Amino acid sequence: MTSAGPGSDPGTGRAAVVRRLREGMAASVLSFPLTSFHEDGSFDADGYRAYVAERLAAGPGALFPACGTGEFFSLDEDEYRQAVAIAVEETAGSVPVVAGTGYGWAQALRFARIAEDAGADALLVMPHYLTAAPQDGLVAQMERIAAGTRLPLIAYQRGQVAYTAESVRRLTRVPGVIGLKDGHSDLDRLQRAVLAAPDDFLFFNGAATAEVQARAYAAVGVPAYSSAVHAFAPEIANAFLAALRGGDTGTVDKLLRDFYVPLVELRDRVPGYAVSLVKAAARLRGCPVGPVRAPLTDPSPADLAALTTLLTTGLDLVGAAL
């Protein structure tokens, strides 16, 4: 943990977190672990600990527990506390831990304080709940959260949250806001935001299956990305990253054509499959993650069969086995 403690200079702590995150982004993909549940839907702390340890063994650049892939929206405060604390314990400082927070600013602050106490290094602020908001309101939301926590913040634009370049410029001036995760894939808008921000402001590709657009994001100055595939097949995720950064266009194209693009097509069949398919694939690999919680649904038998075939194909491509 590198976040500033009581009495310390928060600016120093933020700089250390930014440095470690930048190093992690340069070294590997960003990992968003699933949250483990028992079959009855209760939180499975032991399964989650084992699963997080497996993710860490696969070498991510940073760990983002209790975020969208981790079903933050379905966790109560005690479950959230356990999820973040276990992630912090398992990483033991090896990589930064960025916990999710969100909803309205008051709820976001409650989760932020829990994450602080649990030892997180930073927070990913997910889109607020339900209502649309003007740009001034989006910036004010981040300002209020930043004023109420010592932890550095990464804004997440997705759904109803989409910052203009001017709003991103304003965010860069908010003490404590260190970066932006983009889930819109509007590359014109993102390019303008990158140009509006100082060099030390972090950006990363947070599309649902980020590898499909990784080359396009890199072209506008955002080479770092989160990988949902790392949550169930780090062999594939790591092989893709190595090929991408090594200029191995043939391998990149083959993985995209035979695995990633078909995965996106399967994902798009049913709302919520961006999480449900990931969790089902992890179960196919023997990971102790359990089912999703409502309102998400587990894949249908036909879609699970298609996922099994696709996962086998992807693993074969990188010399691994189901």
UniProtKB/Swiss-Prot annotation:
InterPro entries: Aldolase_TIM, DapA-like, Dehydro-deoxyglucarate_dehyd. It catalyses: 5-dehydro-4-deoxy-D-glucarate + H(+) = 2,5-dioxopentanoate + CO2 + H2O. GO terms for molecular function: 4-hydroxy-tetrahydrodipicolinate synthase activity; 5-dehydro-4-deoxyglucarate dehydratase activity. Pathway: Carbohydrate acid metabolism; D-glucarate degradation; 2,5-dioxopentanoate from D-glucarate: step 2/2. One of its GO terms (biological process) is D-glucarate catabolic process. This is Probable 5-dehydro-4-deoxyglucarate dehydratase 2. Its EC number is 4.2.1.41. It comes from Streptomyces coelicolor (strain ATCC BAA-471 / A3(2) / M145). It is an enzyme of class 4 (lyase). Keywords: Lyase. Gene3D superfamilies: Aldolase class I. Transmembrane segments: none annotated. Belongs to the DapA family. Pfam families: DHDPS.
